[in-house]
Amino acid sequence: MHSFYIQLDLFKRHRIRMAPTRKTRRNNRRQNRPSSKIQHHHMLLRLELQRCPTKHDKEKVSRMIQHIIQDINMKSLATPHVYYVEYPKYNEGLTGIAPIETSHIAFHFWTRPDPKILHTAKSNCLLEFDIYTCGSLSQRNVGHVLHHLTQYAPTYADITILNRNTGLTIERHMHWNSEQSQLSWANWLETPAFH
């Protein structure tokens, strides 16, 4: 016992620091980890639609993207940039990007997609849409995005949420097909999957 008190006295007098214990090192590592709010979610959305926006709808689509940004609790860094692409052939359609505080939203509507790549007879338009954020995308956020796209009468949806925090991990995958599902688009959006 006596030697313990002598060592303790030496540490106090000479301000000698003890080597960190295993438990201390573990706690320090935990404190240095990024917050769980940093998830690096990436939503990849492939939608087939009955209706496609035209080149005259650039402003309308820009407003829709601004509403999506608000509804998923993101912060816009600039007005979305929306363009109509005419060339090359079969690439025609609206395309755009919106910078957000945590990264970006990017999309392209193909007004004349190759019918061989479409899944339903009613599909006339193809939309590829992605949101990347170093934040988190909840099921409710995904539902908000899909709700805004309802105006184009979706016929097929393929949605993948990647968590890119430590790799490319598929966190969620959802699929809907108007010709195979017993649920309509509106009813599908009301399921617990989006709440």
Question: Language-model segments: what does each one mean?
Answer:
Residues 2-195:
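Polybasic/polar functional segments that serve as interface/processing modules
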